[in-house]
Structures are given as C-alpha cells and as structure tokens.
Amino acid sequence: MDRRTLLKLLAATALAGCNTQDDATKDLKVVVAGAGIIGASIAYHLAKAGAVVTIIDKQGPATHASRGTFAWINATWAKQPRSYHAFSQSSVANWHDLHHALNLPIRWGGSLEWFENPERETKLATQIAEQVEWGEPARMVDAAEFAILEPNVAFNTGVTAAYSPNDGTVDPVLATQKLLAAAEQMGATLRYPSELTNVELANGRLTSVETSSGSIPADRLVLATGAAPDIAARIAGIELPQRTRPGVIAITEPMPRLLNRIVSAPGIHMHQRDDGRIVLGEQDGVPQNEAHALRLAGRPNNFPSPELAQEHAQRMLAVAKTFAPGIAAASIDDVYIGWRPLPIDGHPVIGASSNRPDTYIAIMHSGVTLAPIVGQLATLELLDGIVVDNLDDYRPGRVFNEIKRY
C-alpha cells in the first residue's frame, strides 16, 4: 500500500483516526537504531517517503530478536482487547502488500493450535468464538478435518484444534535483509557495526546521533532496539518496564515437505519454510534454577558450547517427533537464543518520548506481525506530522499494568 493510499484510508475509516499537526515536516534526517524487522520496516517506509535515512546496528541486520523469533504472522486469540486484535489484523493484511512488492520469503496457509489440558482446550474454543465475532475466519476443527489439513501430524482424536487460516510465517532474517536492501536502493544508508552511544542537542532539539562509528547528523532518532534493557531510559529519558525472556529457536537442514501449516502443539511450535527447513520453537521456556539464571544473566544468543546447543535442540526434536514422526530424520542446522522484548502489559510501545520528542520509540513483542503497519504509521507520524489516534493505547508514556498474555 503506498503512502497516498494509506493516508486516504486513515482519513476515511474509524479504525485509525488521525489529527494533522500544523508543523508537518518533510525531508527529515532520520537515524533508525536497530536493524531488526521493526527497524527495517520503518527505514523502508521512511526512505520510500523521501526521508534521509541512516540505519545503525551494533552487530548487523537481524542479529538479535529478529533472528531468534518463530516468525508467526498472526492475529490470534492472544491479541487482546479487540482494538489490539484489529491493529494486528491490519498488519497481517499489509504483509501481503510487502510480500508482493519485495518478493519476501513468506509462507501462508494458516495455523493449527491445541492444548492437552481440558480446561485450557475449552477456553480456547471460547476464545476462537470471540475471534469469529471480531471478523477473524478462525474455527475449531476435529480430528478428521485436522488430518486433511495436516496429514503428517499425529493429533489426539479426543480434542479439537483451533484453525486460523489467515496466519503465515516469514523468514525473518531474509525479510529484514530485503527491506533494508530496498531502503538502500531508495537512498538509505546502513552502518554496522555501529552502536548508539549518545545524542547531541542544541536548544533542546536533536542535532546528531553519536555512535561507535562516528557522529550522524539527525533531526529524529527512532529506537527500534528490541530487548536492549536500558536504551530507552538512557537515550529517550523514559522507563519502559519489560519482562524480557529468552526463547530457543532450532532450525533443521532442508528436508522433504512434512508440514503444510504452522503447528502449535503442546510443548512445541513448528513450521516448515519453502526451502524445506523446519523451524522449532519451544513453549515452556528455560528451567527456573540458579545455574540457568547465571548462564543467562548476560543475555547470550548462543549456548556455552555447540554440544549443549545440540543437546537442547535434540530435546526439542524429541517433543516435535511425538507429533510429527517424520521429523525424526531431521538434522539440526542452527540453534539460537532469542531475547524477546515484552512490555509488561503485552502491548507494543510506539511513539515519541514525552521527555525527548525528537526520539521515537518502536519496541514490541509480535514485531514480526506488526512490522508492516508500524513502519507505515511511524512514517506518517515522523514525516507528515500526523498523530495517529489508533496508536494512543501504545504510547511510551502510558501506565503499564502487568498482564501475562503469552
């Protein structure tokens, strides 16, 4: 969707109201800190709109949360309340535009999800009924329909599964790289390794961004820095309470087609990319003990040794094999610890810092789902001086109440 069309859409619908400021600005120099999927989308949309864009990252594109994500594009039952669900639905739809515009590595086909606990299974059915009321084409399916949708997955005939046909998956590393490459083709500059260290102000206004690779003139700074714990407070002067947690992603070598859709089974998530690689994500998280706490204190992305990484991946494969026996033949290619940015109320943080209005924050879980719409709306706010009312619930200055949604 181009910027002109998006402006017309926002003006014409109640979904995302917006108020135009009198001092709309154009041709701004914008530094985007963070070359993950959110930063890449914002940079792409800014460059497309004519901004002078520089993207910086202390390591490189998609080397942090965006590498360690299961990469599930969805607007499922966890997206509460209804306004957040609608926001997610809009972004899922916008992924189709990006898919075709940039030939992104996305696989559509939906998801199947179920639980072993009878009470949780009953609650899931209630949640899916609510999703249907909200316009999501989801439904519960029995074992017979499940076998048609996913014939290579063993399914307990005593339960039903939630089928969400609009869901998809993306290769987050390749998608990030393609978004950044497209931004560069439109004049953006990508600098790495280049760590954000400070900002320079003159009369209270941003003049430059200081990095480990030098100073960059800037009118605006975007913080798309994921789970980094202190950057928002240090650079934007605002505390963002997070309960950041690790999640392990294991990726197999390419193998013949086994899975048609995303499968969210008890204890394991799995999907298969177009290149044949199967992506595994664990559900239960790391054990809560002192040894793991010490090991994870520095937020590592890699296991202490390749042997430990393989041991962990083999445990994940063993769980996956109970549902998809054909995965027993898989060989593990990569194991990575991803650190997910999780604001404690489960919602994204999007908007300018009240303490430093020249600094725009875009930090969230579900970054893969929300990347397209966040890129579009952040560009409207940064370049067109538009205040998008639909983002009001996600501003950095809100009151954060802890709600566990995932």
Regions found by a protein language model. Name each.
Residues 2-21:
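N-terminal export signals
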Residues 30-54:
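N-terminal Rossmann-like FAD-binding beta1-loop-alpha1 element of flavoenzymes
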Residues 48-66:
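Glycine-rich FAD pyrophosphate-binding loop
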Residues 71-149, 267-269, 277, 300, ...:
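Dinucleotide-binding Rossmann-like beta1-alpha1 core, especially the glycine-rich loop
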Residues 93, 104-106, 116-186, 191-192, ...:
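Flavin (FAD/FMN) cofactor-binding and adjacent substrate-gating region
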Residues 219-260:
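Central helical "cap/lid" subdomain
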Residues 256-356:
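Active-site lid/adjacent beta-loop-alpha segment flanking the redox-cofactor pocket in flavoenzymes
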Residues 321-406:
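C-terminal catalytic lobe of FAD-dependent flavoproteins
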